Amino acid sequence: GFLSTVKNLATNVAGTVLDTIRCKVTGGCRP
């Protein structure tokens, strides 16, 4: 349903943001 789609999107965005922050903090960025 719509709510589950929104939840999945939010989870994906949160994961991407966390990965970006971790990448900047550790300096272990990979293209």
Swiss-Prot record:
Its main location: secreted. Keywords: Amphibian defense peptide, Antibiotic, Antimicrobial, Disulfide bond, Secreted. Expressed by the skin glands. Disulfide bonds join C23-C29. GO terms for biological process: defense response to Gram-negative bacterium. It comes from the Eukaryota. GO terms for cellular component: extracellular region. It is found in: Secreted. The keyword Disulfide bond applies. InterPro entries: Antimicrobial_frog_2. It holds the Pfam family Antimicrobial_2. Antimicrobial activity against Gram-negative bacterium E.coli. Belongs to the frog skin active peptide (FSAP) family. Brevinin subfamily. This is Palustrin-2a. It comes from Lithobates palustris. The lineage of its organism: Eukaryota, Metazoa, Chordata, Craniata, Vertebrata.
